[in-house]
Regions:
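N-terminal glutamine amidotransferase
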Residues: 1-169
């Protein structure tokens, strides 16, 4: 049993409220899936940029200095914005494949949650309200979003088992 919510905003004036609206919807679905939750937020893409949302069980160790190491290896600017066990890497779009390959090589403990120009996926084990709070989803803006609450029935309760999933950019 799971719960799925989604919101596509047609009114640009509501975009700053997307995270708050989506969080409230997700919390309402807690009874359908209290084991874990995930949220995908689609923001405005930045021309010439791409993003990877990454996750680590050892975020302090894996994320400290990661942007600098990637920048050095790629010869291009990379920024990292950390949110609890997740972080968003922002880099030149023409370096997307190289960035991902370099990340896998220099930070093998880091997992990619999403890849693209506008998507960010955050997911963890825990009640939906707690997961949303950890990543400050209510403060996010965007054009649309998807949320999922999970009650594991046939598999383990894990971060990687939480939805949504991203198939690539």
């Amino acid at each position: 049993m799971c719960g799925i919510v989604g919101l596509f905003l047609k009114d640009k004036a509501l975009e700053p409220q997307l995270g708050s609206l989506l969080t409230d919807m997700l919390i309402t679905m807690t009874d359908r899936g209290p084991d874990s939750a995930g949220i995908a937020v689609y923001g405005a893409p930045q021309a010439g940029h791409a993003k990877l949302t990454i996750q680590s069980d050892n975020a302090a160790q894996d994320f400290d200095g990661l942007a600098e190491r990637l920048s050095s290896e790629l010869g291009a600017p990379v920024t990292l914005t950390r949110k609890d066990t997740h972080a968003v890497l922002d880099f030149p779009a023409d370096k997307a494949s190289e960035t991902r390959a370099t990340l896998e090589r220099i930070a093998p403990g880091v997992r990619v949650m999403s890849a693209g120009e506008s998507i960010e996926i955050y997911k963890e084990v825990g009640l939906p309200k707690d997961v949303a709070a950890r990543f400050e989803i209510s403060k996010m803006s965007g054009t649309h979003g998807i949320g999922h609450t999970r009650m594991a029935t046939e598999s383990a309760v894990t971060t990687m088992g939480a939805h949504p999933f991203n198939t690539g950019s």
